Amino acid sequence: MGRIFLDHIGGTRLFSCANCDAILTNRSELISTRFTGATGRAFLFNKVVNLQYSEVQDRVMLTGRHMVRDVSCKNCNSKLGWIYEFATEDSQRYKEGRVILERALVRESEGFEEHVPSDNS
């Protein structure tokens, strides 16, 4: 097997895989904390890196029927949640392309402040 190359999304509050600590996303990508997964509380994120995706599955959830893919850590293969590919209800379309990470399967930690110089400095 070859090397695994991981992305780092940066940010002051980071979410990482609870099993291997691979960085997944940051707090600025967080959309909602009001979701529930198989292990309990779950968070909806706009952008998440370092994931592997399963085949598309048709699931009936509390909010209706969705086409989803399970997501797992690219580094250690631990299951982390799912990504919404398609929602049949118009009111649920905002979830499409967004990722659910189950709170019990990720760890939140301090990141770092990035100073990006402006053109004026």
Curated annotation (Swiss-Prot):
Question: Which Pfam families does the entry link to?
Answer: Yippee-Mis18 (PF03226)
Phosphoserine modifications at: 118
Task: List the subcellular locations.
Answer: Nucleus; Cytoplasm, Cytoskeleton, Microtubule organizing center, Centrosome; Cytoplasm, Cytoskeleton, Spindle pole; Midbody
Keyword line: Cytoplasm, Cytoskeleton, Metal-binding, Nucleus, Phosphoprotein, Zinc
Molecular function terms, GO-annotated: metal ion binding
**Chain positions recorded as Zn(2+) binding sites:** 17, 20, 73, 76
The biological processes this protein is annotated with in GO are:
cell population proliferation
Per UniProt, residues of the Yippee domain are 13-110
- InterPro entries the record matches: Yippee (IPR034751), Yippee/Mis18/Cereblon (IPR004910), Yippee_fam (IPR039058)
- Name one cellular component (GO) term: mitotic spindle pole
Instruction: Supply the PANTHER family for this chain.
Output: PROTEIN YIPPEE-LIKE CG15309-RELATED
Which protein family is it in?
Belongs to the yippee family.
What does this gene product do?
A: Component of the CTLH E3 ubiquitin-protein ligase complex that selectively accepts ubiquitin from UBE2H and mediates ubiquitination and subsequent proteasomal degradation of the transcription factor HBP1. Required for normal cell proliferation.
State the oligomer form and interacting partners: Identified in the CTLH complex that contains GID4, RANBP9 and/or RANBP10, MKLN1, MAEA, RMND5A (or alternatively its paralog RMND5B), GID8, ARMC8, WDR26 and YPEL5. Within this complex, MAEA, RMND5A (or alternatively its paralog RMND5B), GID8, WDR26, and RANBP9 and/or RANBP10 form the catalytic core, while GID4, MKLN1, ARMC8 and YPEL5 have ancillary roles. Interacts with RANBP9 and RANBP10.
Q: What is this protein called?
A: Protein yippee-like 5
Gene source species: Macaca fascicularis (Crab-eating macaque)
